């Protein structure tokens, strides 16, 4: 099929499409026939192809929607869900979708802030749910491992923890987050100051490209490999697995929590934290969270991890950050894998097996983030505190994550994630609420407006030209493709430079080369060079 004919087919079926599963007509039926013929699905166990006619369809769809805000009847639904059991199944989906004009979303564990791993607007789409592709193979002697992208961070941590006490991997704090999206956008946790992002520690990958080929690092080339490690993998293909580099950790890790309920004291300590947290030795990570307690009063929580014993930590804190008042009684020594459980708020003594649980969150949320490059004034911290006292911030959080260390050592261009040296910390504003308590969406609007108001208030105090954002905290308020500008590139640049700064242009060039028909696209994907919207 010639490109012009193929493009016309895609455009034709992207117009006037209802979000209902039953309304997509013959091209969906042809897509399913293509899948069934190539996969011989009737003889495959477990079942791979799921449609709305199947009893499994909605349970599979809902099981990995990690933001209940999008688990409502109004949300567009896929025409089908495919749960591959082998790599060739993914190749088949891509080839059949290309042939029959079906858009594809790829879901690892469903934690996209805006639901774009299982939602598409105004076009028929299928979801590739990678839940069955979750094997993990570690090579402790060579400090490496292969991780399929249907696995979660918790499953990776579990395999590491049961295999070795001297190795770790620097990814996110929340164990239920999938490694597919997290690693392809960056991925950070308690080890980021020592070892950088998850993406910084990926040394190979297997990807299904727009032609349905399976490529490793050597076959895809260094530009392609660069793009998927921080540029958001969904713009470039379906990532099947990562080869990760494991990092060294000692037998003893120290963790601590210090809570401050006095506004005056907390504000004073946060002000000092801004000058210390990115400059202390990279063995130390101190995150600050502002939130409401059970008694509904705002408090500041300083949560830390030190790569080493408690006595060394206390000496360091006395020298670098005495204002926190850390005492030995507030610290606990443990192994790295135990610290993973501790940061995930599991009860003490819980078995490692809980890291493999895939429980779905019960709270809807909306989040935004910024990067802070100069300490914000005390008056601004006080105003943030005041805004957390609002009724709609009852379950809200403002999270300050320190950078520095390894994050400052790497250049902006080494991976697509550009927010490196010069950033003191990242600050995230998140509102949570219970969707079932707000049937008419009136309260939801209040929560969304609260996040917007905090974000607007912070404008003078955060990065500028561009105002940076983290692609893993995807925010549709930054913009989406609406066809209001001459080219998709012009639209995409408005938020692309916020996520990627100068790396956006290189990502566009890679995208144009490896996916010239823009098959792998969503409302905020990397555009082609001068593609007409």
Curated annotation (Swiss-Prot):
Its cofactor is FAD. One of its GO terms (molecular function) is oxidoreductase activity. The modification Pros-8alpha-FAD histidine is found at residue 111. One of its GO terms (biological process) is response to salt stress. Keywords: Cell wall, Disulfide bond, FAD, Flavoprotein, Glycoprotein, Nucleotide-binding, Oxidoreductase, Secreted, Signal. One of its GO terms (cellular component) is extracellular region. PROSITE patterns: FAD_PCMH. Induction: By salt stress, specifically in the root. Disruption phenotype: No obvious developmental defects but reduced biomass and reduced leaves number. Increased sensitivity to salt stress. Residues 74-249 form the FAD-binding PCMH-type domain. Disulfide bonds join 34-96. Residues 1-23 form the signal peptide. It is found in: Secreted, Cell wall. It is an enzyme of class 1 (oxidoreductase). Its EC number is 1.1.1.-. InterPro entries: BBE, FAD-bd_PCMH, FAD-bd_PCMH-like_sf, FAD-bd_PCMH_sub1, FAD-bd_PCMH_sub2, Oxid_FAD_bind_N. Its main location: secreted. Glycans are attached at residues 142, 440. Involved in adaptation to salt stress. Belongs to the oxygen-dependent FAD-linked oxidoreductase family. This is Berberine bridge enzyme-like 28.
